[in-house]
Swiss-Prot record:
A GO MF label: acireductone dioxygenase (Ni2+-requiring) activity
Sites annotated May play a role in metal incorporation in vivo: E95
Biological role: Catalyzes 2 different reactions between oxygen and the acireductone 1,2-dihydroxy-3-keto-5-methylthiopentene (DHK-MTPene) depending upon the metal bound in the active site. Fe-containing acireductone dioxygenase (Fe-ARD) produces formate and 2-keto-4-methylthiobutyrate (KMTB), the alpha-ketoacid precursor of methionine in the methionine recycle pathway. Ni-containing acireductone dioxygenase (Ni-ARD) produces methylthiopropionate, carbon monoxide and formate, and does not lie on the methionine recycle pathway.
Recorded name of the encoding gene: mtnD
Taxon lineage: Bacteria, Pseudomonadati, Pseudomonadota, Gammaproteobacteria, Oceanospirillales
Protein species of origin: Hahella chejuensis (strain KCTC 2396)
Keyword Metal-binding: yes
Name assigned to this protein: Acireductone dioxygenase
Cofactors that this protein relies on: Fe(2+); Ni(2+)
Residues binding Ni(2+), per UniProt: H96, H98, E102, H140
Positions bearing the site annotation: Important to generate the dianion: R104
Length: 185
């Protein structure tokens, strides 16, 4: 089940808000300028290829492209067996921002987006069928956990794909990690 925790950015001991209600997650995030929605499930084979995944969600992807000017979409998958999983996790764990929206639709699996908005940190557990769109310039980081298991559709306006501008803020090192929050759930 997806969830949202909201913390003061100087105190991660207890969330100010915790909810697993999809409508409440959407409401809280939309009020903060973050798009969050649930898409209908598509039946996909276990070994679905990136092309078959994009074809299954073509209507939704094309709608997002038209609404937001995205030029490309791709599919990224990570499993616990990936030889570079630790490097990838470390790369995404530092607070950064982008010059374009970061859009992810979870086809399967899960991951945590941490959104540093003013004096709060919104921690969003995204799972299968969740779409999150983090506006350009938003300070954030992502934790896939020590044993990542996810497949996501990504959309870009920049043909170079994922390009981060790291903030240098150490806040991400103070926040609870994936394994701690998933264990609590």
């Amino acid at each position: 089940m997806s969830s949202l925790r909201i913390y003061n950015d100087n105190d991660f001991s207890q969330p100010l808000v915790f909810t697993e209600d999809g409508a409440e997650i959407s409401r809280q995030l939309n009020e903060a300028g973050i798009r969050f929605e649930r898409w209908s499930t598509r039946e996909l084979d276990e070994g679905a290829t990136p092309d078959s995944i994009l074809a299954a969600y073509q209507e939704e992807v094309e709608k997002l492209k038209a609404e937001n000017g995205f030029t490309t979409a791709d599919v990224v998958s990570l499993t616990p067996a990936h030889p570079q999983k630790d490097e990838f996790r470390k790369k995404f764990l530092d607070e950064h921002r982008h010059s374009e929206d970061e859009v992810r639709f979870f086809v399967r699996g899960q991951g945590l987006f941490y959104l540093h908005l003013e004096d709060k940190v919104y921690v969003v557990l995204c799972r299968k069928n969740d779409l999150i769109s983090v506006p350009n310039g938003t300070k954030h980081w992502f934790d896939m956990g020590p044993e990542p298991e996810f497949t996501c559709v990504r959309l870009f306006t920049n043909p170079e794909g994922w390009v981060a501008q790291f903030t240098g803020d150490e806040i991400a090192s103070k926040a609870p990690r994936f394994e701690q929050l998933i264990e609590e759930a």
